[in-house]
Amino acid sequence: VWGRMYNQGQTCCASKRFIVLDSIADKFLAKFQAALALQEPGDPMDEKTTKGPMSQEVALVDLLKQVDGAVAHGAKVLMGGKRIERPGSFMETTILADVKPDNPAFRQEFFGPVAMFFRVKNEDEAIALANDSDFGLGGSVFTKDVARGERVASRVNTGMMFINNIDWADAELPFGGVKDSGYGRELGDMGIQQFVNKKLVRVNAIDAPA
């Protein structure tokens, strides 16, 4: 929940697609919806608030248009999908399902409180779906089998992968993506290399053959 909804999903590395194995999909979805429903919209300065507004009105309007477009092309709204009728640019927490590859929404980034939910039969199908994206900043895999998590992480085409944690940024962790999510890294030991001019110095013996 936090992976999708921190800052109301208005971050580049917030979770966008939730890809779940069929064997646990119903149980996951029920718990996911129940947890999302507990969010309390309000003034971000109020400690009781757990759901803030969109950054600006135009962002809300654009997001609502994206959801309507997804539905027009066959997606189903499992919860939310509308504006919250209260002062401010608030949107209902939303889950979209049945978003097929030919749906324009499949290729879009929903920059707000909208999660796309996918069911898959097995690990290979999950990885193929995860990699079928124009973006590749970060991702997460949750599993009791850490070795399996490492295997999946190595096959997902992103700049960052987190096992049993949400995608996160920290000054000590190199940050960056692949594909349309950019190139290069900032932060961490890799990030400092962006500010270093590297020099080659080769030493030969004075009497070595030319």
Where are the predicted features?
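Conserved C-terminal structural/oligomerization subdomain of aldehyde/semialdehyde dehydrogenase
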Residues: 40-41, 83, 90-210
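ALDH superfamily catalytic-core signature
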Residues: 1-100, 163, 208-210
